[in-house]
């Protein structure tokens, strides 16, 4: 994959041949070379989605330890997000705050947005190259994520929703398998998780170094001044549902947070949706987000290891 800002996902249409010809070995090649592939004009029907996903995602994963609000709609198929339509979701790699992240994502458009609603995608190498040397140096030792998950009543997601489990022992087994993770059960029944993760990673096949963290999404500065101030009146930063610092616990300069967010969005290419479209993404090479929209929009997502 190129590190320049001219990157764009590959696009496959019926003129390139039958859909099934592109969903196995050819797709593997395209994802390594281009990072993301859009399939347009094939008219994939909701009734045929499972068959397509079985080819694209060889081992579909449940959305365990995910922080985005989503709903199940099928066998390890979810709504892409349920954040309010008027909000922009900044660029990120799925579960990059975790020691376990999906290798591949598949987004499917069931209902065309009324207006807006594109899924922006960005090369992680281009995003890294767009950041200032000072910022990259500051993040060299990684970041520390803190998650506060309530027990069913509170702000944000519960630990039961996050881990799709009701058994504490099952959650602990999951966390124990993730290096760099500590946790504690709180007196109110909630769960606090701390994880130290790198800010960049190297793709295991291509060797490409990419920006790979969610520091900007987990930092209060990304919420805007009014929202951040309102939350500060309710609870200290370390008790927010999501909080991030540098790996040593020192605070991250809000200016860095805004630089990460803004340069990622500026380098992104919008994938505009039509019903029946499919977008497949290498979750290390390429980050994704969501533009605001009005009217109907239904985009589904599934993941694989």
What are these regions (language model features)?
Residues 1-19, 85-91, 100-278, 284-305:
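Active-site environment of non-heme Fe oxygenases that use a 2-His-1-carboxylate facial triad
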Residues 9-33, 39:
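An N-terminal domain-cap segment
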Residues 26-27, 90-98:
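Catalytic micro-motifs at enzyme active sites that drive phosphoryl/nucleotidyl and oxygen chemistry
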Residues 44-58:
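Glycine-rich loop at the start of a catalytic domain that most often binds anionic cofactors/ligands
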Residues 58-70, 295-305:
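C-terminal end-helix/capping segment
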Residues 63-93:
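A gly/proline- and charged-residue-enriched helix-loop-helix capping module
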């Amino acid at each position: 994959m190129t590190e320049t800002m001219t990157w764009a996902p590959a696009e496959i249409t019926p003129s390139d041949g039958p859909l099934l010809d592109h969903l196995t070995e050819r797709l593997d090649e395209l994802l390594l070379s281009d990072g993301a592939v859009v399939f347009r004009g094939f008219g994939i029907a909701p009734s045929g989605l499972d068959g397509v996903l079985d080819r694209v995602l060889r081992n579909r994963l449940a959305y365990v330890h995910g922080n985005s609000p989503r709903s199940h709609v099928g066998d390890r198929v979810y709504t892409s997000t349920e954040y309010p339509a008027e909000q922009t979701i900044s660029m990120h790699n799925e579960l990059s705050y975790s020691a376990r992240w999906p290798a591949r994502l598949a987004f499917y458009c069931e209902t065309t947005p009324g207006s807006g609603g594109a899924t922006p995608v960005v090369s992680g190498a281009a995003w890294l190259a767009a950041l200032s040397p000072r910022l990259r140096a500051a993040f060299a030792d990684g970041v520390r994520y803190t998650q506060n998950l309530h027990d069913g009543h509170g702000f944000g997601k519960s630990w039961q929703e996050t881990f799709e489990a009701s058994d504490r022992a099952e959650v602990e087994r999951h966390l124990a398998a993730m290096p760099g993770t500590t946790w504690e059960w709180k007196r109110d029944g909630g769960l606090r998780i701390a994880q130290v993760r790198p800010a960049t990673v190297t793709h295991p096949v291509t060797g490409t170094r990419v920006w790979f963290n969610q520091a900007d999404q987990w930092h209060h500065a990304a919420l805007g001044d009014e929202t951040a101030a309102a939350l500060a009146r309710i609870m200290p930063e370390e008790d927010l549902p999501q909080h991030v610092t540098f790996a040593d616990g020192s605070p991250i300069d809000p200016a860095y947070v805004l630089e990460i967010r803004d340069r990622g969005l500026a380098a992104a290419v919008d994938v505009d949706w039509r019903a029946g479209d499919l977008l497949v993404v290498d979750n290390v090479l390429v980050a994704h987000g969501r533009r605001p929209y009005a009217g109907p929009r239904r985009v589904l997502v599934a993941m694989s290891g």
